[in-house]
Regions:
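N-terminal secretory signal peptides that target proteins for export/translocation
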Residues: 1-16
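A short aromatic-anchored loop/beta-hairpin motif
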Residues: 2, 21, 33-222
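Bacterial N-terminal signal peptides
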Residues: 12-17, 21-37
């Protein structure tokens, strides 16, 4: 199987490259990519100086869509073309890094440990995203904000398993996407609030507390 590389500034568009296979425990193909928001929706673009990229989007109690109830989303991109983010508080299991590397045909010797796998959102659930702390820099690493980055090079997987990768990381399957102006409309309707992101919340493995911690940060900001 192969790997997709797709990192672009501003609105992100997937450029077809190699596609990456993943171990059966994930039951999906892992494709590390940054994507645009879903088509459709309102037509009012986000102001250039109001980007939420690198921040956390937190569902309010008014949001009753079961796909997003009490979700915390790390925003990857947000501009006039739409918005895209990853749900970070819906873990679905773990995957052995060595098994994943074997699926990729990569050398798994000297590799140990697991990656925490999350439900990243309802859009394109066959795509995967590696989110990690920004002290690691590979060939295709892109720092999004809040000390958080994404890397499209599969070498990040081996680095994580060999102990030379980022301090903290997670794997998300699928993403949340918004058309131009759609997210702004949902925020005005009181369905979301945004707060500053940091690794303590993003990579907190106590998913039951992430939403509460993020909402508490909103109170502090106010």
């Amino acid at each position: 199987m192969h790997f997709i590389r797709a990192f672009r500034s501003g609105a992100k568009r997937v450029r077809r490259g190699r596609i990456l296979g993943v171990a059966p425990v994930v039951a999906a193909m892992l494709v590390v990519a940054i994507c645009t928001g879903a088509p459709g929706g309102a037509a009012v673009p986000a102001p250039k100086d109001a980007s939420l990229a690198g921040r956390l989007l937190v569902a309010t109690p008014d949001l009753t869509d079961p796909r997003f109830v009490q979700t915390v989303i790390f925003m990857v991109s947000h501009d006039a073309s739409g918005a895209m983010g990853l749900v970070i508080n819906r873990p679905i299991g773990r995957i052995a890094i060595a098994a994943l590397l074997k699926q990729l045909g990569e050398d798994s010797r000297g590799v140990d440990g697991e990656l925490l796998v999350h439900y990243g959102g309802p859009v394109e659930p066959m795509q995967g995203f590696v989110l990690h702390t920004a002290e690691y820099a590979g060939v295709d690493t892109r720092v999004v904000g809040g000390g958080i980055a994404l890397t499209s090079d599969p070498k990040v997987l081996r680095a994580i398993g060999a102990g030379s990768g980022p301090r903290r990381s997670l794997l998300a399957l699928g993403y949340a996407g918004w058309a131009p102006g759609q997210l702004e409309a949902e925020i005005r309707s009181g369905h979301w609030v945004d707060v500053q992101a940091d690794e303590k919340i993003v990579f907190d493995e106590n998913a039951d507390k992430q939403w509460e911690r993020a909402m508490a940060r909103r109170v502090i900001q106010l």
